[in-house]
């Protein structure tokens, strides 16, 4: 069991900023991520992927170049979901790499697992192969969000999907 000045739960934008800033102020910091990858919803299924998909669609469809080359201009005639996700995945993976490098450069300890409180200053972290406990003077809970699924909207993960289902959508997306 190690003692930290700050433990952070969640590696999304809020957790990242809290951990990095505390480390830059000379504090001993640890951060816990429940998923197997850093970045939270923003990096993995939300903001960055959705904007990357949009930009890929605009580029491949030639939308921005049509004023120069005419209304029928396209970079690629038949655009597939694979074409769109290729660029999005590149951007996502680069962002994950940046986040991990920031943590390493600032000496922030990173664990992948599920954090739970034993008491106000002690966390249990259940990892894939073991359990560890750490104490901290302060704990920041930055556990993120999930897509809203209002009960009156019939999400079926085929015709109506949220951002969590988008990257698993496959080629059928263009048949809808």
Go through each PLM region and give its residues.
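The conserved SAM/SAH-binding core of class I Rossmann-like methyltransferase domains
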Residues: 9, 32-33
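Beta1/beta-strand and adjacent pyrophosphate-binding region of the FAD-binding site
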Residues: 1-14, 172-176
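Glycine-rich flavin
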Residues: 2-4, 20-27, 33-173
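Short alpha-helical segment within the catalytic ATP-binding CA
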Residues: 17
């Amino acid at each position: 069991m190690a003692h930290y000045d700050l433990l952070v739960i969640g590696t999304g934008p809020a957790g990242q900023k809290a951990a990095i800033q505390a480390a830059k102020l000379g504090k001993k910091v640890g951060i816990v991520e429940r998923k197997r990858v850093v970045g939270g919803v923003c990096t993995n299924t939300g903001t960055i992927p959705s904007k990357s998909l949009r930009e890929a669609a605009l580029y491949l469809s030639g939308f921005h170049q049509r004023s120069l080359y005419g209304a029928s201009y396209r970079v690629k005639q038949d655009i597939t979901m694979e074409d769109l996700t290729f660029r999005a995945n590149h951007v996502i993976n680069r962002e994950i790499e940046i986040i991990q490098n920031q943590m390493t450069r600032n000496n922030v300890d990173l664990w992948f697992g599920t954090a739970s409180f034993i008491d106000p200053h002690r966390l249990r972290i259940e990892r894939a192969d073991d359990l560890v406990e750490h104490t901290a003077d302060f704990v920041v809970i930055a556990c993120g969000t999930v897509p809203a699924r209002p009960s009156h909207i019939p999400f079926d993960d085929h015709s109506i999907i949220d951002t969590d289902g988008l990257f698993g959508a496959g080629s059928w997306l263009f048949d809808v």
